Amino acid sequence: MAQKDVLTDLTKVRNIGIMAHIDAGKTTTTERILYYTGISYKIGEVHDGAATMDWMEQEQERGITITSAATTCFWNDNQINIIDTPGHVDFTVEVERSLRVLDGAVAVFDGKEGVEPQSEQVWRQADKYDVPRICFVNKMDKIGADFYFSVRTMEERLGANVIPIQIPVGSEGDFEGVVDLVEMKAKVWSAEAKLGEKYDVVDIPADLQEKAEEYRTKLLEAVAETDEALLDKYLGGEELTIEEIKGAIRKLTISSEAYPVLCGSAFKNKGVQPMLDAVIDYLPSPLDVPPAEGHVPGKEEELITRKPSTDEPFSALAFKVATHPFFGKLTYVRVYSGKVDSGSQVINSTKGKKERLGKLFQMHSNKENPVETASAGHIYAVIGLKDTTTGDTLSDPNHQIVLESMTFPDPVIEVAIEPKTKSDQEKLSLSIQKLAEEDPTFKVHLDQETGQTVIGGMGELHLDILVDRMRREFKVEANVGKPQVAYKETIRRKVENVEYTHKKQTGGSGQFAKVIINLEPFTGEDGATYEFENKVTGGRIPREYIPSVDAGAQDAMQYGVLAGYPLVNLKVTLLDGAFHEVDSSEMAFKIAGSQVLKKAAAQAQPVILEPIMAVEVTTPEDYMGDVIGDLNSRRGQIQAMEERSGARVVKAHVPLSEMFGYVGDLRSKTQGRANYSMVFDSYAEVPANVSKEIIAKATGQ
């Protein structure tokens, strides 16, 4: 590996992710890429639990990918850094954080199913970060696989402008290869070829000639429209060269105006090499994407950019933290500008703390290749960073920048966890600290009432796996409670001039603070859920005490007034107050801020909010009525019904609290023929009768 350490020519580097629905064959596709690029010598099969990218025990047992390992490989003198992303909905944060540091992606679809709910969600996340993509229709060897149907679902469900640049030769068991519409040749894999390493380039089979011409014409029309010179040439009846066609497809892909579609079967080792060629031909290099944007630490309005060049000051974004069995904490970073040697000192400009880079590696799944220098445009794993967590920026101490970070959703589901012995208590706190570093959507708090540790996550599977890792990696023996919903509280009306005076006179210096506030419902533009405005004039409260009132109010928001759930969506306006020369203190004003917020919230029509999930059930028509009836009985609201490849799809919004154990109920109602997916949608007010139950349960009545 050493001779190919880090390519300095960034035009030959691709940072890509492979994104897909849970079973579209993403890990198998990644495995094949690593095999053909010469890194894995034995192909790992997910079915045997041997895949090299899936490196946690739970992943191999469950056959799904949870942590996005970053892997480097080489293809025809180009370097590809791949970030494997999970397709299961509970791990959307892993997908989001990988998309943030990618330049391009390969979207893998199941040739039989086309676009599935999860692929739709991941596609939308990629839109959010504006990631150029190529599409790979996988599993073309499966019974029922249909390339043209899959392409149609991309147009209809994703609204994407897709351009097939290949069509399949044969299908299902007779799938042999692909017709390359750019070169107008067929590439077929014979049964003898060892693991599909060699393929033959042959003339297009006669029965496909017409179809190939039809799709080639569509491709050329799309290509010709990118450039006037090409359009003139095309309309004038001249042949476009292969270079011209590829250049135009590249332009369309990088600007996200179109998405090239390829096909194959990773499992049967067909079509993977042409897909690798397409990654190099059409996806952007670090030089093709806009420079990284950020701001001066502490001054969000002062924007700065960093170009992907080693001459610029060093900047990098930490996008993942993992625990390694020997090295302890590994931090994955994407370097956006400059270069830095291992052992150097940098600054975590998000937190303002100095960090020393220990060893630097480029990773292959979980084998490490040490490197001396980290340079712009590449992805590395670093040892030795103490305070850096996901989303933090590292930069040159003399030229600091805070790069745009990622937003992580709040958990929607919680379980209480109780260690069995005193030594388990210590292991538990260590495991929680380690897991929280790795996964920003994993939240922990101590329940004041019960003294239990409560952990929160993005879904039942997410929490199952976290608890499983505590038991396995950290040997924690603990009792785990039933999953609970993460409710919130808010207010419905504005209350004005609510006052509170905190005073305590006991010989010596007492405590005194008086505050008057308005409290009103509030939702910020960027999803902010709290705002504090100071309107005190004439020094009625000294300036140094104002932040204490704000801090007190925020403390009080952690436990709401109805059932002790966190308060959200409030704006506090501090109007007036009074202080005492001797008895006032920051503490006194903090207590006053806290108490006045509780008093005001109680008068402002407080309500409980619950997480609502967008649920999509795919069912045979015979069970449609039962499925809808069942969703209605769970307080669900049916949003839409449609037909999809012979089955019915019901889309509904259902409260999370009603969805526990749904998977078993759905199976028994439909004899196991229906399946569902659910993603968090929004928080909504709880109906009065349910609210009463929640309050009674919380207050123990």
Swiss-Prot record:
Pfam families: EFG_C, EFG_III, EFG_IV, GTP_EFTU, GTP_EFTU_D2. GTP binds at residues 20-27, 84-88, 138-141. Keywords: Cytoplasm, Elongation factor, GTP-binding, Nucleotide-binding, Protein biosynthesis. GO terms for molecular function: GTP binding; GTPase activity; translation elongation factor activity. PROSITE patterns: G_TR_1, G_TR_2. It is found in: Cytoplasm. Its main location: cytoplasm. Transmembrane segments: none annotated. One of its GO terms (biological process) is ribosome disassembly. Catalyzes the GTP-dependent ribosomal translocation step during translation elongation. During this step, the ribosome changes from the pre-translocational (PRE) to the post-translocational (POST) state as the newly formed A-site-bound peptidyl-tRNA and P-site-bound deacylated tRNA move to the P and E sites, respectively. Catalyzes the coordinated movement of the two tRNA molecules, the mRNA and conformational changes in the ribosome. This is Elongation factor G. It comes from Mycolicibacterium paratuberculosis (strain ATCC BAA-968 / K-10). The gene is fusA.
